[in-house]
Amino acid sequence: MDVISDGEWRRIHYLDEFLLRVGGHERARRFKHNDEVKTTLVVTGKMQRGDPLFVDEAEFLVKHTDCCTKFALPSPFLIAIRKWHEDYSSDAYPTMEHYMEHLTELLALEARALAQTGIDIIQLDDPALTYLCDRRLTEQGQTQDDRLKREWDIDRQAPQAIAAINQIAGELPVEVQLHCCHSVHKRQSDVKGDYKPILPFLQDAKIDRVNLEFAYQGTGESDDLTLLPEGIGVGMGVVDVRNENIQTVEGIELIGAAGAAIIDPSRIALNPDCGFAPDYGEPPSIDEAYEKLCNLTQAAARLRERFAD
């Protein structure tokens, strides 16, 4: 493994962990997700700036490894899409854009604090950008998640999301990556679609790498990489985390090689499609995650040898 995180097994949920610490959110909004009625956090009051939230976790990671380290934060656009609702939030933040502006400010402060701990890579997680790739959702309003029933406009929302990312990433002295998965929950994906709709918008993104999913149908396609802007690398998600099936080394290598046939192999890294960390869903076992990562590293070694200069 060339890059590691702390695994995030400490967390409650990759959004809620942040939101519960900044305050202003209540578990009050009921919605239906895959025929299951849930109650989610929604912003109802002003968030508060305080001490950095995740410095202790980052320092622990840096202290216990000599490897390149990564720490992930949720993106402002993702949080705003899911956690602002006019029926609950308007008194605190009149519009979703007001909420998103404050989120961006708080996350920029957090990212700068993390960079000072010695973390090498800061990743912003933004499945909401991938929502814009699902034509069924954006054109027909088809979704299993009530929170996504809204007006979608890629020409307005993609630049909005990237502007927020740039405010966070712009002056960081570390590598910045963007992760766009298909919103995996309980081993199911909320949306489907290749990445062709959003990749051209990354031309203006102040990121070093974008991490995408390619391991199962309904996600990325290798020819998506023809639209990857110059100067940005790609993390090809080549391991499916949604089920217990263990992909072979050869199968993983095949996906990576398809990408290397389109762009310079030096621009490609391999990674799992999405995270193995638990949340309110059904996490994989440690043994499953370990075996999948072992096959991933073997495939990466074979590809390095295959495409060596």
Predicted regions and their residues:
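Domain-level signal for soluble alpha/beta catalytic cores
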Residues: 1-309
